[in-house]
């Protein structure tokens, strides 16, 4: 096999090589059954065992309490932007949202289709370079829930704290930082995460929801979007994204083998420290995000002269450092350094950055 490139894509993102190799080995013949997982009936004993093991491994990794349901659904995180208010927001109620970037803004825009939304705080006043402290939030007294995005993949803005909302359910989009470090699931009413960053391939979204929040869907909520129906049917009301679920299960097993999310936190800290040190120690590269809001997973940076962007990307591609172009709405560069992107990838990137700066500064 030729050497695999270092993939810094924001999503669909890098998967652990060991996971891909195992999937390759099992592609035509899963554990002697003579067929691929993608050919299995989702009702078969074999697939039900695969799905159950994946759920248990995720529960183990995040220490999910027993009074939470873990759902493996379709539609990605973007579908959750509608599914959450349809399940949790009464027609005459209000929900609080915190806007810190493009993804939380999209969640707000979608939720407004279904009811009253109060934007309790916005990072717009900081040009999306910092997160407003909770003392500055304008929370509703009787909100159905409070929603925020823990890590904005495009802007590179991440909460390093968990909002405190008392008895009001806290809902969080963790699509891009779930499993990157330990969390206390009991602090949240609902956690959701699109799979294609830190969980597995696209086509899947994981929802972790406290049981007392089930059964609240509006009468107009489509059957397929009702959390209780999904929970009562083991995420198999219809045919699920079986292969994505299976591959995500392999990622969970790999994470356990690495030492779990505690080990991931140590590695991820080393990766982000190395990259930010290279950026901050240079007059050639810059990152404008407030230090206490810098993302561990998505690191945007700019070159001193944007006319050099194409040359930088071309040189990176030649060295197997792929997908470093920033989002079209932001520009510049972005290195997404999820769990499957090793420290060696960041070391190679930092070495190239130094080489490029020496040549062009």
Swiss-Prot record:
Positions where N6-(pyridoxal phosphate)lysine occurs in the chain: 197
Cofactor field: pyridoxal 5'-phosphate
GO function term, MF aspect, one: O-phospho-L-serine:2-oxoglutarate aminotransferase activity
Domain of life of the organism encoding this protein: Bacteria
Keyword terms: Amino-acid biosynthesis, Aminotransferase, Cytoplasm, Pyridoxal phosphate, Pyridoxine biosynthesis, Serine biosynthesis, Transferase
Cofactor note: Binds 1 pyridoxal phosphate per subunit.
GO cellular component: cytoplasm
Chemical reaction(s) catalysed: O-phospho-L-serine + 2-oxoglutarate = 3-phosphooxypyruvate + L-glutamate; 4-(phosphooxy)-L-threonine + 2-oxoglutarate = (R)-3-hydroxy-2-oxo-4-phosphooxybutanoate + L-glutamate
One Pfam short name: Aminotran_5
Lineage: Bacteria, Pseudomonadati, Pseudomonadota, Gammaproteobacteria, Pseudomonadales
Protein name: Phosphoserine aminotransferase
Assigned EC number: 2.6.1.52
